[in-house]
Design a protein with these regions (language model features):
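Core catalytic region of metal-dependent phosphoesterases/phosphodiesterases
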Residues: 9, 17-114
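Conserved catalytic scaffold of divalent metal-dependent phosphoesterases
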Residues: 67, 87-169, 173, 177
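A short beta-strand/loop micro-motif in the catalytic core of glycosyltransferases
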Residues: 79-80, 177-182
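Conserved small/polar residues in nucleotide/adenosyl-binding loops
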Residues: 195-202
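Residues at the N-termini of beta-strands
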Residues: 47, 177, 185-186
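A glycine-centered loop/beta-turn motif at secondary-structure junctions
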Residues: 189-194
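Catalytic metal-binding/acid-base residues of hydrolase active sites
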Residues: 10, 54-55, 86-87, 130, ...
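Extreme N-terminal starter segment of soluble prokaryotic enzymes
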Residues: 1-4
């Protein structure tokens, strides 16, 4: 299986707001994301995993449509995403009810849920933020289950105010790969299992 794991892209961010170069830097973030889509197409990846904060804020409908068009351009890649603390799913969020391309699955629930992709023999688990801060570990107790060969988990947080979790306990949950977001620093928390990602500077 081949997949790309990203998080904290923060589309819609305007770095250095008020300065002449701010708009250009904001567009550079979008272009970084487009490069990831092109990479997924070129490498024919099975999955694109997005572990929260694809957007810097509540996404505009036109922004969701632009992102969805990019996802639709890689129909052989299954895109699975969750919302993080910046783009959390508010009651009036455009995330709710959005008509994603056929190859896209958003795990909208604030509680852990699972999507099975039989043709890839893979199950992907995760949950989205429904508010800016989540003080409890909603992933505590989530375990891989079912008959799929591969089990992947999307997780966003890891500090005291954003779904605090214990890496050691997560390692015992039976997942083949845990794709983390929020840390803003790529790294390996547990070798061969628990990884953080930051796509903003790709």
């Amino acid at each position: 299986m081949r997949f790309i794991h990203i998080a904290d892209v923060h589309l819609g961010m305007q770095p250095d707001a008020g300065f002449p170069w701010s708009e250009e830097r904001g567009e550079a973030i979008w272009e970084s994301f487009r490069r990831i889509i092109r990479l997924a197409s070129r490498e024919k990846t099975d999955f694109l995993l997005i572990a929260g904060d694809l957007f810097q804020r509540q996404p505009l409908l036109r922004e969701l449509k632009e992102v969805n068009d990019l996802f639709a351009s890689i129909p052989e890649t299954i895109v699975v995403l969750i919302a993080g603390n910046h783009d959390y799913v508010k009651r009036e969020s455009f995330y709710r009810g959005f008509d994603w391309a056929d190859n896209v699955v958003m795990l909208l629930s604030p509680e852990p849920e699972c999507v099975e992709v039989p043709e890839k023999r893979t199950a992907v688990y995760g949950c989205s933020y429904d508010k800016k801060e989540i003080l409890e570990n909603r992933l505590d107790g989530v375990r891989q289950e079912g008959k799929m060969k591969y089990h992947l988990l999307l997780a966003h947080g890891g500090d005291a105010r954003h779904m605090p979790w214990n890496p050691g306990r997560m390692a015992q949950a039976g997942f083949d790969y845990i794709a983390c977001g929020h840390i803003h620093k790529p790294g390996i928390l547990i070798p061969c299992l628990l990884y953080t990602s930051d796509a903003a500077d790709e």
